[in-house]
């Protein structure tokens, strides 16, 4: 399923509890808030209206500024945006003599990891006389939906009512509604609710703002699986205070930022890394466990589903760069939920099967991911975890079933992205398997390790069976084979021949490798994953520069792009942003690519 990216360049933020993907760049209004609900195996999302992606509906929450009884349209005279650490959107706008600054933060870090959003605003009066100011937050609940890949609207109607301490609670009218939002300010605010099919609400306060004075206001939006839980989280956010929550978040993000020594590259890595970290990984509101999805952003057609390959080879490596504790939890969680049938297809977030289809790379990814995790973190004790050991044994068994009767080569049903190869034996798949076998031989118990196929034999057989042209000076590798004489040269985007050095089949300077990829260098492809693969190819520096300049989907990954790098389909690809973040870091540190 492919979705065209929205025309509005939405600002995006969030934490593991909530995603805030639709912050309007024109006025900083919030049009959608989403959370993961494990029991539903889906995202639950609140919006101002069903056409929220087009920006034509009322906002779920927007700032209210009234000066001397005259409403101010925030952003009417222009609005400037910056993103701290590549993730925290901050804005500033002028309205007459007033300078309005704001930050929208989903708290993260020590004593800040809550299911909520902080909207912090300051209003500075740069005029020569005092003004009567109303500052507040208002919004409309006009749409609620559950989404795996396609959205389904809730039919029970929307409810808004005044809570305790001048707060407002938004929820569904049914007692089974799986999400509630509690909204309140710090300090004294009045609250109003307007009933209706799409109920409206307002929090505001009045004050006099003298010349040269600055007034600060903070609003909290808290979430829970029902109204009482949301109200409790709101109470905690008020108690901890917006300044502490924002400060803790900024500190946590600074500690997580990887460094390459190049400031522009570091900013690019941080942007992709934090997008993957917060929009591919979620903690469900109803059980607080961690889950991984392709993307929590509503304009990505892969939605709240995931393949083992993407979880372990795209998302996990990026997380390891920033948060080794979460990386360990994520690795074990994937093994727990998905390891019962490694590489068996697309999964819902809870591990149940969404779409069957065996991927050789998906099965092999468990061993490679474990080894990469240990190398990155030095946590070799992780192999003692029973759930991880079970997954490794299971992945080995599933790969062995696919082994050719007489040759040490392995077949696959689908490529890593689910596409079907023209021939069942692929060069990419067997290169990945060979690397996995290297890991399994020193990870499994001694008796089982003796039965593990020698990876050198796999690589040797691959080179013999996939090399075409008898003349060594013109030899190259086929991408696929049936091992009976029929081969295919077409490069599969998700199983590109560019990756072969990455999986230690050939050196990136090897003449055979260079001839193999030369035939595909001139091919135009809309698949962004191929641009990623080119980073490890002979012209990695050019690919690095292209990725640095590509606009993508407002700076984040998209599954398909045009030749200039603008998103065409399935933007907001959080898992692929994880791949980009890791590859940019890897290219700088391991390959020495510079821009």
Regions found by a protein language model. Name each.
Residues 1-53, 303-306, 356-373, 486-508, ...:
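C-terminal capping/lid segments that line or modulate ligand- or cofactor-binding pockets
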Residues 258-266, 318-331, 374-393, 442-456, ...:
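Structural helix-adjacent loops and short alpha-helical linkers that scaffold large soluble proteins
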Residues 394-405, 411-412, 422-431, 449-527:
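Extended ligand-binding clefts on enzyme/binding-domain cores
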Residues 212, 216-235, 300, 346-365, ...:
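The feature captures the catalytic groove of carbohydrate-active enzymes
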Residues 1-261:
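Terminal accessory carbohydrate-recognition/targeting modules of carbohydrate-active enzymes
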Residues 271-275, 333, 372, 391-402, ...:
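Alpha-helical scaffold segments in carbohydrate-active enzymes
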Residues 236-297:
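An acidic-aromatic substrate-binding cleft motif
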């Amino acid at each position: 399923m492919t979705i065209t990216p929205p025309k509005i360049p939405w600002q995006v933020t969030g934490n593991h509890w909530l995603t805030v993907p639709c912050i309007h760049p024109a006025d900083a209004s919030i049009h959608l808030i989403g959370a993961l609900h494990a029991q539903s195996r889906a995202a639950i999302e609140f919006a101002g209206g069903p056409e929220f992606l087009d920006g034509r509906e009322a906002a779920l929450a927007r700032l209210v500024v009234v000066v001397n009884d005259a409403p101010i349209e925030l952003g009417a005279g222009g609005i400037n945006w910056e993103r701290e650490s590549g993730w925290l959107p901050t804005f500033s706008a002028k309205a007459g003599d007033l300078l309005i600054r704001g930050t929208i933060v989903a708290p993260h870090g020590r004593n800040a990891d809550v299911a909520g959003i902080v909207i912090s605003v300051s209003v500075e009066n740069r005029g020569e006389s005092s003004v009567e100011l109303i500052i507040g937050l208002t919004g409309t609940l006009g749409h609620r939906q559950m989404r795996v890949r396609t959205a389904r609207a809730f039919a029970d109607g929307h409810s808004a009512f005044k809570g305790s301490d001048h707060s407002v609670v938004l929820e569904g009218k049914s007692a089974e509604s799986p999400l509630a939002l509690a909204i309140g300010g710090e300090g004294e605010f009045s609250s109003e609710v307007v009933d209706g099919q799409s109920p409206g609400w307002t929090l505001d306060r009045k004050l006099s703002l003298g010349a040269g004075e600055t007034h600060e206001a903070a609003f909290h939006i808290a979430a829970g699986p029902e109204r009482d839980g949301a109200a409790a989280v709101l109470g905690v956010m008020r108690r901890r205070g917006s300044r502490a929550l924002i400060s803790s978040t900024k500190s946590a993000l600074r500690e997580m930022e990887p460094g390459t020594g190049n400031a522009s590259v570091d900013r690019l890595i941080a942007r992709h890394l934090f997008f993957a970290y917060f929009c591919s990984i979620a903690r469900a509101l109803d059980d607080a466990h961690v889950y991984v999805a392709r993307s929590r952003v509503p304009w990505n057609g892969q939605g709240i589903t995931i393949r083992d390959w993407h979880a372990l080879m795209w998302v996990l490596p990026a997380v390891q760069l920033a948060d080794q504790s979460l990386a360990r939890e994520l690795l074990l969680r994937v093994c727990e939920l998905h390891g019962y049938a490694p590489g068996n297809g697309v999964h819902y977030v809870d591990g149940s099967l969404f779409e069957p289809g065996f991927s050789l790379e998906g099965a092999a990814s468990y061993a490679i991911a474990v080894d990469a995790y240990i190398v990155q973190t030095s946590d070799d004790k992780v192999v003692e975890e029973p759930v991880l050991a079970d997954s490794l044994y299971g992945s080995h068994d599933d790969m062995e079933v696919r082994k050719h009767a007489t040759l040490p080569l392995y077949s696959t049903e689908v490529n890593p992205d689910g596409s079907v190869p023209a021939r069942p034996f692929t060069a990419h798949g067997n290169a990945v398997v060979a690397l996995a076998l290297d890991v399994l031989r020193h990870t499994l118990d001694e008796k089982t390790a003796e039965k593990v196929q020698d990876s050198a034999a796999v690589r040797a057989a691959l080179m013999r069976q996939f090399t075409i042209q008898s003349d060594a000076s013109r030899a190259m590798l086929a991408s696929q084979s049936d091992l009976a004489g029929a081969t295919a040269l077409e490069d599969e985007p998700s199983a590109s021949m560019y990756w072969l050095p990455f999986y230690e089949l050939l050196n990136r300077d090897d003449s055979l490798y260079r001839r193999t990829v030369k035939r595909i260098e001139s091919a135009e492809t809309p698949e962004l994953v191929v641009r990623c693969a080119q980073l490890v190819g002979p012209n990695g520096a050019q690919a690095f520069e292209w990725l640095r300049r590509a606009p993508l989907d407002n700076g984040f990954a998209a599954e398909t792009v045009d030749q200039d790098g603008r998103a065409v389909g399935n933007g907001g690809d959080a898992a692929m942003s994880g791949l980009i973040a890791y590859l940019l870091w890897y290219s700088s540190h391991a390959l020495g690519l510079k821009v």
